[in-house]
């Protein structure tokens, strides 16, 4: 419903951008002032700016649906920076006009130069952001757990989250992730949810993606938990629609579970596994997902109550919530994703006010919490001010 209420605001903002586009381009050359050019520009802009809606409504043919969704993801990111830069330029114009009484700002040359600066800035940020999102960094962590892991002195974990396989990520992204993982020669691979992007059909050639993921090499295997986007849920410009009680079951897509099984990824849903009689891996249900599909999840204490707490306990939980409760439950290493570290500016700043640990490392008593910015993106197909990453965690055990 919120998407419907915000639609008039979105329309007004696009009209605002289009108006200033006419003014700036028109001052570059008289040909751009013609009615024909204005009509063509308006048609092209409307077609692109409405792709969030048309991609939501038009499902077939599948090829057109994909084009609209991909275009929408790129446009939403670019539009965000168009709006920020145009608003900034307009504020500067008003200050120059009413505070400094600068008469030269009304000249054609001033408009043309201002427009060129704005266009260059948008292009620079957008191209850089789109390219940067596709580059995956390797972020290292060193952790010491004051417990014995039987004969195991250390453990190398590769930790990823938020792959968001779909319109923004497919076979190329999967190959890059697997290549980076295998290069680390891990003992264990953990995936903290949001493997999918709300729509299984969004994955282009899922069989190929599964085949690629099966090539992950690790001594003890690959373990994962669900994230809030690991369900079949219609999205309009980032806003979801609640299907109600009768539609809750429709959100579950069995193909997602089958995808993980075929990819040799073991899904843990409020479950714990003892590996090599040395340490536990616990996968937790996602807090947001269970509300939508009307299920319940166990508390951290319930998940660990039957475990041998003398052994190291590794938690995989999509969202970095209830950190104190998790620490009190005897967990030694808590691995989370979800935040994307804000993904794009200014989100990378505001995210710090929303989470106790928005990204990186935090210690709670003897528990180590690591939140990754994710190896993929959600929504806008870009990263500005943040990195796509996989994490390597070298865990040292204090064997007595």
Regions found by a protein language model. Give the residues of each.
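Soluble catalytic domains of enzymes that build or remodel membrane lipids, polysaccharides, and related
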Residues: 148-400
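Non-catalytic terminal accessory segments
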Residues: 1-134
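Hydrophobic alpha-helical transmembrane segments in integral membrane proteins
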Residues: 112, 122-147, 167-172, 176
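Short, functional N-terminal and low-complexity linear motifs
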Residues: 40-43, 59, 108-110, 145-148, ...
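Short, functionally important structural connectors and interaction interfaces within domains
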Residues: 63, 128-130, 135, 144, ...
